[in-house]
Amino acid sequence: ETLGPPIPQGMPPFHDHFAFPDIGHGDLTEEEYAQVNALSPKLKAMIQNHQIMYHLNDAFYADHDNIMVGFHIEDAVYGPLYYDYGHDGSRSAIGRNIENHIMEIARDTVLVLLKASPEAIAKRLKESPHPRGVLKEQDIEKVLARFDEEVAASTLRYRLTYDTTDMTPEETLAQFAKDIGPHLSESDRSRLLAHRALTG
């Protein structure tokens, strides 16, 4: 909405389906969710491998507004903790290979880490639970530490981190809109100026 066209044709505006059992766009039936959850760790790892590699193809990265939520970093954190695969650190190693590929096809990628205090996250889990959420309250501190580790190990050059403990979603978005400016491409800037001129 801010940048204006081109709007991705035939693709969702973002991809946030890298945590079981929500591994695709659109809801599954309860029976299908149960089937996904019943898969063996080996099969879950295979599905994630294929899903992540699929989302690295040219059709996604031809869209300059490509947004991946969680992606390989979420997989490296949640795989060993909740899905019983990647205990040997292999998901982190795979993540670095994925980032090397991203750097070849989209060098201007910005890695954004959203975090909050353990207390704030626990409160949000109680007040606004995800119907099929993965995170368990007793794991909050461990998960926060693991996300920090994966982001620190990332080979992606550009990073933004937001502690949302005392920020509303609107405030976080407004701050991001300011901070992303230096990372916009010339094409992004041209689109932004044209859109502002057209919409006043």
Please provide the spans of the model-predicted regions.
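Conserved P-loop NTPase "ATPase switch" module shared by AAA+ and STAND
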Residues: 63-77
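Conserved substrate/cofactor phosphate-moiety recognition/catalytic segment
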Residues: 1-62
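Conserved nucleotide-binding/hydrolysis micro-motifs of P-loop NTPases
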Residues: 72-74, 116-122, 166-168
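A glycine- and Lys/Arg-enriched "phosphate-lid" helix/loop adjacent to the NTP-binding pocket
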Residues: 78-150
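Loop/turn-to-beta-strand initiation segments
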Residues: 61-66, 108-110
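Residue-level recognition of beta-strand->loop/alpha-helix junctions
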Residues: 11-13, 113-115, 163
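NTP-dependent small-molecule kinase module
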Residues: 129-131, 138-200
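Structural alpha-beta junctions
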Residues: 2-9, 103-108, 154-158, 185-188
